[in-house]
Amino acid sequence: MVLRELLSRTEQIDDLCHLFGALGFQAAWEHVPPGPWLGTGPAEAAGVVRAALVARHDVFRVFALEARDPERAVRAAAQRLAAHAERGLACALGAAPRRLLCAGWRAAARGPAIRVAAIPLERPPGSSLETLERFSPRPRETALALSLRVGEALASEAVTPRFFRAFRATLERLTDRLSTPRSRAERHTLALTAFTRVLFLYFVQAKGWLDGDRRYLIRRFDDCVAARRPFHRRVLDPLCFGALNRPAADRSGAARALGRLPFLNGGLFEPTALERRHGAARWSNSDWRDAFDDLLERFHFSARETEGGDAVAPDMLGRVFEGVMDPAERRASGSYYTPAALVREIVRAGLEAVLVHRLGLAPAAAERWIHRGQPPERAPDLRRLTVLDPAVGSGAFLLGALEELTGLRCAAGEGPACAVRRDVVAHSLFGVDLSLTAVRLAEVRLWLALIADVSAGPDDPELARIAPLPNLDGHVRQGDALVDPLTLARALGGAPAPATPASELERLSSARRKLFGLAGAAKRDALAGLARAEAGLARELLRAAVAALERRSAELVAAAKDRDLFGRRRGLTADTRALLRRLRASRRELRAAAARLEREGGAPFFAFESHFGDVLARGGFDLVAGNPPWVRGERVPARVREALATRYATWRPARGRGFAHLPDLAVAFVERALELAAPGGSAALLVPAKLASSGYAEPLRRRLAEGACIERLAPSLAAGGAFAAAVYPMVLVTTRAEPTGREQVATALGARSTTPLIPQRALAGDGPWILARDAVRVARHLGARCVRVGERWRPQLGVKTGADDVFLSAQPGPATRPAVRGRDVGPWRATPRVHLLWTHAPDGRPLARLPPALAAALAPHLDRLGRRSDYRAGPAWQLFRTALAYAPCRVVWPDLARRLAAVVPDPEIVPLNTVYGIATREPDDAYALAALFNSRWLTALARLHADPARGGFRRFNARVVRALPLPPASPSVWRVLAEQGRRGESDDDAIADLYQLDAADRRALAAAPDPL
């Protein structure tokens, strides 16, 4: 507090004596003539009015300058100190905004490096105060040692992408230093576990809780280096496993020698199963020196999620989690960091729906409480409100729910905030994730949230009575929220979950509550009690599921043995035979799980009914919120796809012409979220925006529109840049309740009374959800009155090679044709940038024998070409989907573009498989379609139905173009359109007249260029 007050009172350089005196320097005041000291040129250039020596430590001197350009002045002074190899610091005061500028120098390979730090004088963040504190001289410290430390403090960086790169590089280096276990994935997990502990210690250290020293770890490390002792064995091991995880009275002498340290409980500070199996991972002093220099001491740490962007705050653990995953792993898991501001708005939207539908508040009262902090006169009790994140990631949504529920309860009169926050974690928050790393990071963020506002300072005698960190083992679990063997077995067997005795459910709930606040031997007993409660529920659930599978199998066999009217046995159809195989496989899996339960004593896998059965018995969770994985169905393993199709009614391939796209994994998560929500409860999810338009999501859209209340359907286009996935996000908030037909859907986040609304009934029926109401009216009117493109022509994809590196060349050759990708096509233009080895005859069939030059080029690749996924039979050099390549008349457009952009290409040009096209019999048809497709009206209509992608792009695939209306046009009018196409122009007004669009229709389409 002293530093904050001194900074706020600093008005002129004379006041810096008091500031540096408070830091432990010897105060001084000696005038220094600016010109002779700095040099006339630098002094005049910076506008230095006066300079003075204001503090010293040994021969380390602190100078203050008053100047017109304060940053230029301190840089000049630091350069002067460096030129004379003097130890010191230069300071100046800046205005607008008021700030203290400090500059120093440190030796570098290419000469002295000048470092400048700017410290706000009003409301300085914790990171700035830490920088000042790092200037403090230590007892008996030499000027050289102080100068080196000041240089390190000035070199500390604000958080930039460099932090995340440095984190990943450090983690990879620590992983590579380990020799065991053999699996690199396990070594990576061990390194991440240990490094997560150190990160947590840096956050705790920032509060001054490690022996009152905000520089505790680096000082202990320096002491170990000076004494030639291993830092990991002498400090980290006893700190984590002998001090922080034990009450002070139970610590060994070595642990007590580490200083005054709080008891933070086990959890993070106890060996994991992997560490118990392979032994704790340890690194040398050299490895830790690199970690300190490259990462830990380079950036500021703050235990507050809301700390300014110049500090490493706990919410960055989400981005760290995303950063330590390589891109292929991230795409496979669909795990993406969600920005905190977006999380807050999604959680608020979900809680607002819960307050209205689950707890009975009036909409206006719920909005005031959520968005203005004004509780109703009789506020409902939120102490048992439950929130689940079924794909918890790094815990962003649980943290968001923690802050919002704490705020609501404190606004209603509960307090203090730290006690309410702990109670929310104890009773309201639950999470699941497949990744153990994600579970650990979520726990760390929840623990940090609990200590962030604890007021005990480093010298506070209450430090010893800081509440130990709670045990979250019963709240955040590793497991599969979508498909566990029990729910899959019930889907196959067609049996509901059995009723569970209330005594068993109370035993589970009581065990979780008891475990939350215990430590030591009592904690171990409570953990065993929780495991027994979960195992007891799992045992009965497994028994009932096996019985259901056996009944269903017996029914199928009995039906197969039944005889028809002619006395013949009916037998098993192919479908029933496949179902019987899966029933028996599921039964084997459950029996093996039951045997493992009896052998090992714990539940063999995570299931909501066994681990959170007490919550489900009350109907379910009040709010299910999160950012579930976005994974294209084609990337999901075949066995998992089969399970999803069995388990979820809405997870079905798109039906229609052409390739049947598999649903995104997010489809199943939406259905699952509503299952887990209690009646009147809500699901608030961040999902791919393409769920509103893709054909594969139509069963889900129909189910939501007809069987639930849709509260929000809000495209988050503004968040697309901050969001790292490859498609636009959309916020979907639904309530588990039957719609009445009067529901209104908000199409934006924020206070509901200020957002645009559309009737939910407008979302019913087939087709995409379109939020631009006036444009929808125009589109439906045209659809009812006009013939569609798909009724006359068939849009199709261009040529697919299956081996672009073999068939495509930058240079033309005797056996090549110019080719275009989607990015090479625009309105009225197709610019070939590659050339395709052409292996087909003019009629489209593959050549039976290749010309010698072509045969020689392809000969080394024939085995590979025969293994392409599209290859079935015939010459190995054949290409696929060649119809557009040899069609004499065709119009083509890119699959991915900001607008529908069409061209009639030269006959020699081959469209590749990121280009769609239509082959026509007559050239006039191709040119007329180009004129229509390039008009603003067809682009607007196409964008209404096209799936969104990043950067404002849309996917203008065959489904979208098939549905476009064709204007009623006589042959003469069609010829006029064709002439426009030949000239490379579209007459928007004339085309609007052809469609009979009045002024209101044109305004509606013009106003909705990007409706979703």
What are the functions of these language-model segments?
Residues 1-36, 42-47, 75, 86-89, ...:
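Signature of N6-adenine DNA methyltransferases within the class I
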Residues 389, 431, 685:
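Conserved SAM-binding loop
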Residues 320, 346, 393, 442, ...:
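Conserved hydrophobic/aromatic pocket- or pore-lining residues that grip, position, or stack substrates
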Residues 139-205, 219, 281-424, 438, ...:
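Class I S-adenosyl-L-methionine
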Residues 246-335, 523, 530-567:
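A short N-terminal interaction module
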Residues 43-129, 272-276, 289, 632, ...:
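Polybasic, glycine- and aromatic-enriched phosphate-binding surface used to engage nucleic acids
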Residues 182, 186, 364-386, 422, ...:
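Flexible, glycine/threonine-enriched loop-and-boundary segments that flank and lead into catalytic domains
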Residues 484-605, 617-623, 635, 639:
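Basic, amphipathic N-terminal segments
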